[in-house]
């Protein structure tokens, strides 16, 4: 993958190639399949869809697979597909699994997850306005979503959409999750969004509208009013996997930082001799190792006691990991100077991805408030 990094960046940054993949891309995926490095992210409780690894075993693999920005796609463990596969493996009917899960696991299609909305504060996961109304053997969807990752690429064939189906219920039982094919009549991508000025092609984030979109009732996942339960089940493991990704990206930034410090000379000596640079390297190593150990502790807790028992650790990871990666990549950029902010290194992408993810799947502040409550409850304060 490393030898192809520059090729990939040059191809995807060319506006003529928007939403396309390089010709050689599928060949790398075939190699991953041949070497049995495919779908490793599904832990063994997702049998028969899992290769049989536990979360602790997955953690180190996922860290390594995340060192190149786009490499997760080569191993079929990229978001939001991996989260959607987990949902379908855990909650999907046999028919839903046959139609949607199997092609995802084979890497034949891609998918999106439509949760965030433009007209409400999405830091509240129950705060949604998209309506899901039953009409005989169909559900009708009306509303807007945005920051719908993957939806722009032609390979995206369906979305998991969360909306309000039962407003009469209590707050956490008002929403449902339903499968919507991207070719459904009434569904429209109104624009592709730029994150830090970039389209994130070939996946992309979309601003989308549902106008009387009809889907069969068999597309509903788990049942009416189960949307929040599904979202929490999906986002919990997703945050753990994001944390492993950030450890991998930060480790890559540290490796590049050390290489630069040893090889770059200023005022008659290598950067590595400068006390300020040494301190930045040491601080970065400490930050990465602390986060890595928290990832491993979270994985062990999930394996022993389940995801629900590990929610406090997963919450800590969502707070710590993106900020850690942002800080490490920022230090590396400072040592690289102008090269650090251009396309000649992956550092700019690492920095913007980690900054973006301090908002995605819930902002830092929400997780810190929630974690404070969990902490006080555990200490009986």
Where do the language-model regions lie?
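Flexible, glycine-rich active-site loops centered on histidine and acidic residues
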Residues: 85-91, 113-114, 168
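Conserved hydrophobic/aromatic beta-strand scaffold that supports enzyme active sites
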Residues: 112, 129-131, 138, 158-162, ...
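Alpha-helical interface subdomain recognition
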Residues: 1-69, 77-79, 91-96, 103-108, ...
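Short Gly/Pro-enriched turn/cap motifs at secondary-structure boundaries
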Residues: 119-123, 150-154, 167-169, 196-204
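A short core secondary-structure module
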Residues: 137-138, 142-190
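Flexible, small-/acidic-enriched active-site or ligand-binding loops
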Residues: 127, 183-214
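Cytochrome P450 core scaffold surrounding the K-helix E-X-X-R motif
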Residues: 49-50, 122, 189, 219-224
